[in-house]
Amino acid sequence: MAAGLITGSILFWTLRLGIGPTPTSRKVRAAIRDILPDNVSGHVMELGCGWGHLIPTLREKYPDKKIEVWERSPVPALFTEARYGIDVIRADFFKAAPGNAGLIVCYLYPGAMDRVERELIPQLPPGCWLLTHTFSLSNRVPVKTLRANDLYQTPVFLYQVQPA
């Protein structure tokens, strides 16, 4: 019974959000670790943290930074809170005020990446970093691109917001 409810919840939120809570593989996490910027001026936000697999990498790289994670699907959010001892914001991050963010990390489907570009990036301060993997931003050129050493050579993209 419980397994059915858990599966049903994950399926519901996958259909609603357009992407399931897919764990980031070890090899993609290694590429992310290698491309993360050393200097981040504000706090770190992970949009759509899923099962929380990037949290240890972000905590290790930025031990003095506030790390804010967002996930709307309840089952992965509860797992992440229990496993990593972090409060997960269970809200629509497109309604967030990321004003003093120094780094945004996200793995979202292409339609959501378009919304990030259209709605979220204009709110970010100049110099803020944006890291994505698998799916790039359509209208921006990354500062750096790295390919994971996995079967798919998964691309990891690093962007930086420029002054208007």
Q: Language model features by range: what are they?
A:
Residues 1-39:
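S-adenosyl-L-methionine
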Residues 40-50:
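Conserved class I S-adenosyl-L-methionine
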Residues 52-56:
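Glycine-rich SAM-binding Motif I of class I
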Residues 66-71:
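Conserved SAM-binding motif I beta-strand of class I
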Residues 80:
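Conserved SAM-binding loop
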Residues 84-93:
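Conserved SAM-binding strand-loop segment of SAM-dependent methyltransferases
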Residues 101-115:
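A short SAM/SAH-binding and catalytic strip from SAM-dependent methyltransferases
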Residues 112-164:
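C-terminal substrate-binding/active-site "lid" region of AdoMet-derived donor-dependent transferases
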